[in-house]
Amino acid sequence: MAFYTSVNRYGNSILYRGYNDNGVAINDRIKFKPKLYAPVDADSPLKSFFGQNVKEIQFDSMGDAKEYVGMYDGADNYQIHGTTNYIHQFITDKFPKDISFNINHINVVNFDIEVASDDGFPTPEAAAYPVISIALKSSQSSVYQVWGLGEYDHEKCEVDMRGDLIQYHKCSCEEELLAKFIGYWSKNYPDVITGWNSRFFDIPYLVNRIRIIAGEEYVNKLSPWKQINTRKQTIMGREQVGYELVGIQQADYLELFKKFGYSYGMQESYKLDHIGYVVLGDNKLSYEEHGSLHTLYKNDHQKFID
């Protein structure tokens, strides 16, 4: 069965990503012609929610529909019916029946970045420190893709990979690391991206760092539609800034755990190491002998990548 993974609006176009009946990925820019309903005096087979006679009006574009609604805004004797959320209208028109989503087709990418932080805590707003590694794993692949700046031998990996493999991309500098990552990403756009606190750290840090190093053109390549939207949210009195990579859904594991992991109760810490132990009985690979992650990076790059 066909289904969608993302539907966005850009001007008079619908930006559609999904899968067809054969499980083939679809990326389509569609000129959508919405419908609204206006009152009529004559008897009509079409009725409003309140039983009023209405007629269907199809517009050439979403912009035309918006202009029409604006003309009658505040007119008590001429009420326009139908949804002006044209994304919802598009989805309803395309999928009039229940949608069967096939999880086996959906490409979910788990990713994580590491940042050099030898003289302070890196903040995504400033993105002042270099990105020194990026790792990702697609649900459609058994291979971890890792970009780093030092030597790494996957055959010496200390972590139980449970049959998965590691493809390591050694880079000579941060600029090369970001360029190679963007090159891979733009050829393998996922449907969903996830990580631990990825919405308010990994993604905004990466967006802002790429903007500093390479410019807006390369930032836009993070989206299959070459569009990045800023999203602000106030959490515990503090404004957090995230970015929507248009065409890719975000499912932050930290947010999901706080929302759906209530059976574990309140936690003393929401760091990944602690939650991993609470849920799975496993901690992250220990590097306490090095004191800090930055010292580990400097002294044992092999274990740092692990």
Predicted regions and their residues:
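The two-metal-ion catalytic cores of nucleic-acid processing enzymes
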Residues: 1-306
